[in-house]
């Protein structure tokens, strides 16, 4: 109701301008609360409307619905020096780079590589040689609580989200998943005492 009041006050165009500054998963959450005609109009005004629309196809309680597309991928066929050069050009925000994800030419998740390993490895070394292949991932349809528990179990800062073929789709961060665990714990507590939220 507050969101609908806000839209009446500022309009779809202004809402879209504000949403341009927010992560895709948050934008998707906001758009899900709009009426269908407002959803379509807002998506049409967003520069990254197609990406947000893809997130909307997943349930809000799934890993796909909560994932962010703000992550860095590196192709396993490049050298360490090429990876470093790419990162220098890309200049990803430090608050988004928990892991560097290594993919094959099709986009299948192969593993992760740390910035430390990039720095200490020979520039000519293939990224495939230093990739940590023991990576824990969830599928886009995984329930958010299960994804949060996986992240917690392995003490990760972020967990990659893949499709059914293993292609990297997005990343869920610990920040997102801590909120999920808190919500789930609250729901469980209410159920235990016989109350609904």
Describe these PLM feature segments:
Residues 1-192:
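Hydrophobic packing positions in regular secondary-structure scaffolds
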Residues 195-197:
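Cytosolic juxtamembrane amphipathic/interface segments immediately preceding
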